[in-house]
């Protein structure tokens, strides 16, 4: 089965995240935050793109969920490699679900000035 998810976000929503550490830590892991610091370019665009990626994955997984699982946005980690491609690292119940269902997850993120968009495809 294949499923897709897509999310678009206004980049401006994330300006205050850089000034509010608690807000940043509510949605992003320490590893993600460190990854933002290493990245060149706009940190705000990167924040928005990774948030959109998390939302896209939730949308893609929702038709596959046969029962409710408990997860938070920090259980879905989005890390960009040195090559520039973003990848999901899942934790806790959502990771167990992905392993049990033998899911392959594909992600692409793009941002342009005011908007960030992410597209996810899931197959098993």
Curated annotation (Swiss-Prot):
UniProt source species: Borrelia garinii subsp. bavariensis (strain ATCC BAA-2496 / DSM 23469 / PBi) (Borreliella bavariensis)
Q: What does this protein do?
A: Transfers the 4'-phosphopantetheine moiety from coenzyme A to a Ser of acyl-carrier-protein.
Give the residues annotated as coiled coil.
none
Q: Which InterPro entries match?
A: 4-PPantetheinyl_Trfase_dom (IPR008278), 4-PPantetheinyl_Trfase_dom_sf (IPR037143), ACPS (IPR002582), Ppantetheine-prot_Trfase_dom (IPR004568)
Q: What is its EC number?
A: 2.7.8.7
Mind telling me which GO cellular component terms the entry cites? cytoplasm
The UniProt entry, under Pfam families, shows:
ACPS
Give the protein name, as stated in the record. Answer: Holo-[acyl-carrier-protein] synthase
Q: Which family does it belong to?
A: Belongs to the P-Pant transferase superfamily. AcpS family.
Keyword match Transferase: yes
What positions does the entry give for Mg(2+) binding? Answer: 7, 55
Q: Which GO terms describe its biological process?
A: fatty acid biosynthetic process
Which UniProt keyword terms apply here?
Answer: Cytoplasm, Fatty acid biosynthesis, Fatty acid metabolism, Lipid biosynthesis, Lipid metabolism, Magnesium, Metal-binding, Transferase
Instruction: Tell me where in or outside the cell this protein is found.
Output: Cytoplasm
Which reaction equations make up its catalytic activity?
apo-[ACP] + CoA = holo-[ACP] + adenosine 3',5'-bisphosphate + H(+)
The molecular function GO annotations come to: holo-[acyl-carrier-protein] synthase activity; magnesium ion binding
Q: Which taxonomic lineage does the organism of this UniProt entry have? A: Bacteria, Pseudomonadati, Spirochaetota, Spirochaetia, Spirochaetales
Instruction: Read off the Gene3D superfamilies from this record.
Output: 4'-phosphopantetheinyl transferase domain (3.90.470.20)
Required co-factor(s) are: Mg(2+)
Q: Main localisation, per the record?
A: cytoplasm
Q: Does the keyword Transcription regulation apply?
A: no
């Amino acid at each position: 089965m294949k499923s897709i998810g897509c999310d678009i976000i206004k980049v401006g929503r994330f300006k205050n995240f850089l000034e509010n550490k608690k807000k940043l830590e509510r949605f992003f892991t320490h590893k993600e935050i460190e990854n933002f610091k290493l990245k060149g370019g706009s940190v705000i665009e990167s924040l928005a793109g990774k948030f959109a990626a998390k939302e896209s994955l939730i949308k893609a997984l929702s038709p596959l969920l046969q029962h409710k699982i408990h997860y938070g946005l920090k259980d879905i980690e989005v890390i960009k490699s040195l090559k520039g491609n973003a990848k999901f690292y899942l934790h806790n119940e959502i990771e167990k679900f992905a392993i049990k269902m033998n899911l392959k997850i594909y992600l692409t993120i793009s941002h342009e000035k005011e908007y960030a968009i992410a597209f996810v495809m899931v197959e098993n």
